Amino acid sequence: MAHYRVSSEVENIMNRDRSHRKNEEEDEEEALKLAAMEKLQRLPTYDRARKAVLKGITGGFKEIDMKDLGLAERRELFDRVMTMDDEDWHGEYLRRLKSRFDRVSLHLPTIEVRFEDLNVTAEAYAGSKTVPTVLNSYVNLLKGIGTKIRVLPDRKKRISILNDVSGIIKPGRLTLLLGPPGSGKSTLLKALSGKTETGLRSTGKVTYNGHELHEFVPERTAGYIDQYDVHLPDLTVRETLKFSAKCQGVGTGYDMLAELLRREKDLNIKPDPYLDALMKASVIKGHKEYVVTDYVLKVLGLEICADTIVGNHMKRGISGGQKKRVTTGEMLVGPVGAFFMDNISDGLDSSTTFQIVKSIKQMIHVFDKTALISLLQPPPETFELFDDVIILGEGHIVYQGPREDVLEFFEFMGFKCPERKGIADYLQEILSKKDQEQYWANPELPYRYVTAKKFEEGFKIHHFGRAMRSQLATPFDRLKNHRAALTRTTYGASKLELLKACLERESILMKRNLRTFVLKSLQLIINAILIGVVFWQQKNYPSTVEDGIIYMGAIYLEVQMIVFSGFFELPMTIDKLPVFYKQRHFSFYPSWAFSLPTSIITFPLSFVEVFIVVLITYFTIGYDLTVPSFLKHYLVLALCGQMSYGLFRCIAAVTRNHVVSNTMGCLAVMWLMTFSGYVLSRNQVHKWLTWAYWTSPMMYIQTAVSVNEFRSESWKDGLGVAVLKSRGFFVETYWYWIGLLALILSTILSNIITSLCLAFLKQYGISKTAVLPDEREEADSNNTTGRDYTGTTMERFFDRVVTTRTCNDKKLRIPFKPLYMTFENITYSVDTPKEMKEKGIRENKLVLLNGLSGAFRPGVLTALMGVSGAGKTTLMDVLAGRKNTGYIQGEIYVSGFPKKQDSFARVSGYCEQSDIHSPLLTVYESLLYSAWLRLPPDIDTHTRELFIEEVMELIELKALREMLVGYVGISGLSTEQRKRMTIAVELVANPSILFMDEPTSGLDARAAAIVMRTVRNTVDTGRTVVCTIHQPSIDIFESFDELFLLTRGGEEIYVGPIGHHSSQLIEYFEGIRGVGKIKEGYNPATWALEVTTRAQEDVLGVTFAQVYKKSNLYRRNKDLIKELNNIPPHAQDIHFSTKYSQSYLSQFQACLWKQHKSYWRNVPYNAVRFSFGAAVGIMYGIIFWSLGKRKGTRQDIFNSVGAMSTVVGFLSSQSAATVRPVVIAERTVFYREAGAGMYSALPYAFSQVIIEIPYTMAQACIYGVIVYGMIGYEWTASKFFLNIFFTFISILYSIYTGIMVISVSPNQEIASILNGVISTSWNVFSGFTIPRPRMHVWLRWFTYVCPGWWGLYGLTIAQYGDVETRLDTGETVVEFMKNYYGYEYNFLWVVSLTLIAFSMFFVFIYAFSVKILNFQKR
């Protein structure tokens, strides 16, 4: 015992000694720090702003230049300041920053946004003009012309979006914008941020600190955060935010810091060195983007996926909720002073939404910034974070004022919010005609529907409204405007810095798409080898002009190959345009900064590619073997590659659409190549078309290369000059340098036009859904059951369960078998991404789901919940059988039997989060198509249609039945309409088990209630329904029966009943040691997420996954699974006699019906292809006018064959190129529908190829009739119809080739490259540039497998195969055809059958590829 006391005393002495030494060390460190800071304070302000005092490696403080701050030092500095120990680390950090400004009385800039009498209207067509079809596109064009010249009346209707709205968004107060869909929220946000869409008419006044929008640059003063997530899929999250930070710059941050340092020096104030260093790093070029990006990543909770690519629907990346946060982060990294945020919580769980809004609120309050945020379903705890609320309805402001007073106003209007009702939900539902009456609380007056206009009038006479008008009547004192508040410079950084940022981004994208560039280079090399082999040593002993012309054909093909190699720039450029347009609106950079880096990046690549091509072709063909000739030849072709890239980028910028760009690209190349001087010699060009010859860059390229070769020493005795003259080329050597100069100028011109188009043209096809007032009323009244369906508290749902079941039993009488699903120990893992391995993660596999078990039963509605990235969608994909990548372990049973995917697809439905549908069908047609293919074949047509009508009524889609689905974010249905249609598409399939991924995401409270009412009614019919859900309101959450709660890492932490008022869920978590009690009225869903975070686990010292696995609840669930897996006697597994619901013939009929509807409405494809056929026909008719009547010389025949080769060459290439975007646009829909077991791949494939036949025939007739008549071919029935037939079959096999190529390609870029190889090989062996008899014997066989050769054979021999007219050489045309081309008239039927066989072969390859290949990674 004595020994213990002595030891204890010694230990106490040692502890005191250590504590004393520690205090001495801290005092010494503080003295060193103060000395270093005093030294820094003596520096001039400019130097002081660029230097800081930090602790060095040796332990002492030293002065460092911020420019030399390394990555490790920057990270350490960031971690020191952003202390994560405190839950309120963000607020504490902001307060420390603000405190530093307050100590020197330095006021930060603030912005007060006012809007007075703001009106926004749009014009829209009414009637059939609103539904695009091939026919009415032409009719509308003519009507539009008639309207312009005032021959026809204007049939547009003016739609009012915002009606005389006025208000004030105050700095330092967080304002919430609420309103139902179509109320004008997005329009108001855009109008206030200075980004009103093109086509909308705006009147009224918007001011910032008393300054109107034209007095400063609103794009850089205010940040608008769109509800649509548009990002480059190949960039990581960090790269996306860093690029945004670079472009937006530091604003006035550096000037404010300099002023702060000056005042601190005057007052002898020494700041915290670490905070000082971080503030300086955040405004120093080269460091700002890193510091701010890391800060925003931490605030938004994106650190976990910072180095993961964003991805898209075809490329796996981050989750939908994470994408939404990236969209928000893009603006937060900038220096803007006012934020207008549109639906930033879509796809986020309620806990994450709360944390993000809380962080934004802290920023707004501490720095007096301005923010107006639109949310669809704000949970109560998030709603309470806001200071003010604006409620918008039908374009009228219903209320604007303090959040805590909003209920008082509606009580003044006679309405009262029930208990346990979310205020935000109540505020949105009260504007609905169907929901309003239940909140009426004035017994003295009978209820009458109160419109938004009436609410607005009531607000004006309320004291809140009078106070608002009084404030608006007093103008803002412009003298109080801080000079740094409003931005007056167009861009946030210098032009050079913006160019560098775009160049860096482009280099990253090129690295990520390196495979595409490698394949494109490989395409060029293969084509070069083909040309080199075909023209192998053609001029060993050139002795005639004919030899020279054959050789000139090699030059023509080489130039054509290089020109077409730039075609892949079309899809690559257009894919990036949506991001460009978004960033253009934000004034991130000038248009040339977007286009120029692509030219710079591809410049060395192009020169290397062309060098390899020239090495292959120059020596195999046998060009002049002197160094100057070789270098000059290479230089022209290298510049030709640059010209080609510039040309196709220019076409992409002009057309802005995949289909239209492919069409116009082919048209441009056809025009240019026709006037290259080879297809049609200069002497044969009509005088009125000589301008086209002189403006064609191809003419200068062909002339330069030809002059360089034929004026060389290899072509002696004037033979080279004779060859040039025979085709009308210039013979003077200076034409080489003229050609070189013309190439450089055309390249520069293309880039200038590209930049101008990017700067001034709007995004292609933008058209939003507009609901006219009468349609709104119809939407409100289409449900015949009226208010019996409109209860908004879930108690009303349960009160109606019996009634609903009875109603459903009477109406929805299509039978189904109730099924349950169990699963045990489900583990899902993927290969660890390369980006994560580069960060030091050594595991080969990344586990996303970790040993999950559970059971889903009929009549039980299960919520699958968890924070973003917990694995909710992943689990649903695994259970539904939609995963095609990764590694799945565990067991899945359906009603006790092992799950068989083919049978399971027949009895299950999956509502995907991304709402993937065919854009050119109407709502009703989409439902009819789904029911047609998925309901049992014994259901008659009448019953099926009645069933569809009832589903549409249930989900309130009747008012939208004739509306096109449209493209997401561009046209057609709104987000919430699209979501409801997704559910309806699955419900009409009458599934026994239904999976729903985020069914309420993107919906407002009322739409979410409609959806959940539908879901509840579906469950009550005895179906098994599982929903992932992010941010449910109390009402929605408590409509579920059971909860499957996941945490990060894919582990289950609660699987069981929710209970009345969430009692069982609350009881479970409150029973865990250390978990606090839920607050009265708090959302249980949000509370469950908040108390189970990883941070809470660290605080409590528990792992919730382990707690669950040790609980009685876990054991009960295991027993339940075991019990359900015990198959009862006489039970039978799900079995169907066929894999699909419908026969192959019915599948084909349904798919063909859908293709017919889509094609008839696909104006950019079919109307453009008809117009293209007419344009090309007229163009070639003019160029080759009356050429068919001339048959006196070989040159006449050559020119005529050249005209025919356009069908085989250019028209066919255009057809193959334009069909690719159409097919690939439907591919994602095909993956969803095939995954749902709707049809086999073969009926789908055959419907795709069959639907092309009538449209191709129409195109062939349009082109053929025009060309045939204008060129003047012989007017006999047989020759005319043969010409039409060979034109038709040549276009058709080319279209089938394009379809085939896209079916074996993961994306359009790869398809473009593969198509380039095929097109070049067909052109080389078509027999135009080098006829078959002139080919080497060992190569002639290839013409038999070349459709281009057969196509030209058929067109030529049908016209000239029986012509006995003698040529100037003495031989007849028939003899010339046989001797020169190898064509014989009696071979005509063989040619016809062969071309049909080629078409069928390409169809077979397409069908086979569609069946076995899947490029979607899930």
From Swiss-Prot:
Pfam families per record: ABC2_membrane, ABC2_membrane_7, ABC_tran, ABC_trans_N, PDR_assoc
Residues annotated for ATP 1 binding in this entry: G179, P180, P181, G182, S183, G184, K185, S186
Gene Ontology cellular component list: membrane
Disulfide bridge positions per record: none
Keyword Transport found: yes
Tissues in which the UniProt entry reports expression: Expressed in roots and siliques at low levels.
SMART domains: AAA
Protein task: May be a general defense protein.
PANTHER family: PLEIOTROPIC DRUG RESISTANCE PROTEIN 1-LIKE, PLEIOTROPIC DRUG RESISTANCE PROTEIN 1-LIKE ISOFORM X1
Name recorded for this polypeptide: ABC transporter G family member 38
Species: Arabidopsis thaliana
Gene this chain is encoded by: ABCG38
